[in-house]
Amino acid sequence: MWIDCRTIARSIEERTKERVEKLGFTPKLVSVACTDDPSALSYLKSQRKKAEKLGIAFEILNVSPEEIVSTLKKLGSDESVNGVFVARPFPPSFDEKEILSSVPVEKDVEGVNPANLGLLLYDEEIFPPCTAEAAVRILERETNLSGKRVTVVGRSVTVGKPLALMLLKKGRDATVTVCHSRTVNLEEITKNSDIVVVAVGRAHFLKKNMVKEGAIVIDVGINYVDGKLQGDVDPSVEEIARVTPVPGGVGQVTTALLFEHVVRAAERQRK
Ligand code: NDP
């Protein structure tokens, strides 16, 4: 069975729109870009569309590699800006940690600044990373996480690690296993899990024989194969498990949450 993520994304967006109307001013998101990566550019395009729909002002700043850190720092003191997003991936020569540390913490709507990520260790979530939060929101709609055996495949700073911490959070109380490319007997681990989240970046990586019947599977993957978007989960898994689709799954909820965070940042800054 496919999990209906569209409805989840729409309901987040509806609440965001209502909150924008109550704010009394137009909140603003600025996306800083120093990339010609096609998927990053297409994400910026979809941000523009979504911002228009939600009544949020949106600007893209195209900057040179030398300008990126200073631009981010300046945006911190610009009172007309409520949220700051940085387009990734960065070219290999970039110091990712330095750049992300320069995203103003209180405007870090994507939750990428190490200061925001660090709060997850304390079970605090001011701006959790949007994709990890999307996975959690979807899971909480589908099940009670307490005591569930969850396997997260992928240990990136963007998705896998923060997600594992968020699932472990007191109150959510999942039992979490994190797997990666050196994991031995991955199939045995995923097959014994109530929930599997796949954030690997390989098309159709998780096969039906790796999943327990009745499990919930969250597909984070974005892979372009012959120009077609495919997830990390083989479509046949849907025959035995509840699976988020790609496209139309985690990605939609992720974008909806980014804008929810912009409004939350604006509400805080107004106070
Ligand atoms: P990374 O490349 O940073 O991480 C991939 C992870 O997968 C690594 O931890 C790697 O292990 C692990 N891995 C690779 N091969 C295997 C294997 N054979 N068995 C088990 N684990 C393996 O990717 P991201 O986390 O940034 O992204 C993952 C996917 O999610 C990508 O397709 C990306 O495009 C997508 N994505 C989607 C988003 C959305 O909103 N829907 C947002 C962000 C990402 P190791 O650490 O050992 O190398």
From Swiss-Prot:
Binding site for NADP(+): 154-156, 181, 222
Gene Ontology MF terms: methenyltetrahydrofolate cyclohydrolase activity; methylenetetrahydrofolate dehydrogenase (NADP+) activity
Record's catalysed reaction(s): (6R)-5,10-methylene-5,6,7,8-tetrahydrofolate + NADP(+) = (6R)-5,10-methenyltetrahydrofolate + NADPH; (6R)-5,10-methenyltetrahydrofolate + H2O = (6R)-10-formyltetrahydrofolate + H(+)
Gene Ontology annotations of biological process type: L-histidine biosynthetic process; methionine biosynthetic process; purine nucleotide biosynthetic process; tetrahydrofolate interconversion
Pathway assignment: One-carbon metabolism; tetrahydrofolate interconversion
EC number: 1.5.1.5, 3.5.4.9
Gene3D superfamilies from the UniProt entry: Leucine Dehydrogenase, chain A, domain 1 (3.40.50.10860), NAD(P)-binding Rossmann-like Domain (3.40.50.720)
Keyword annotations: Amino-acid biosynthesis, Histidine biosynthesis, Hydrolase, Methionine biosynthesis, Multifunctional enzyme, NADP, One-carbon metabolism, Oxidoreductase, Purine biosynthesis
Family matches, as SUPFAM superfamilies: Aminoacid dehydrogenase-like, N-terminal domain (SSF53223), NAD(P)-binding Rossmann-fold domains (SSF51735)
Signal peptide: none
Any Pfam family the entry gives: THF_DHG_CYH_C
InterPro entries: Aminoacid_DH-like_N_sf, NAD(P)-bd_dom_sf, THF_DH/CycHdrlase, THF_DH/CycHdrlase_cat_dom, THF_DH/CycHdrlase_NAD-bd_dom
Any one annotated GO CC term: cytosol
Coiled coil: none
Role: Catalyzes the oxidation of 5,10-methylenetetrahydrofolate to 5,10-methenyltetrahydrofolate and then the hydrolysis of 5,10-methenyltetrahydrofolate to 10-formyltetrahydrofolate.
Family: Belongs to the tetrahydrofolate dehydrogenase/cyclohydrolase family.
Assembly: Homodimer.
Name of the protein this chain belongs to: Bifunctional protein FolD
Species of the source: Thermotoga sp. (strain RQ2)
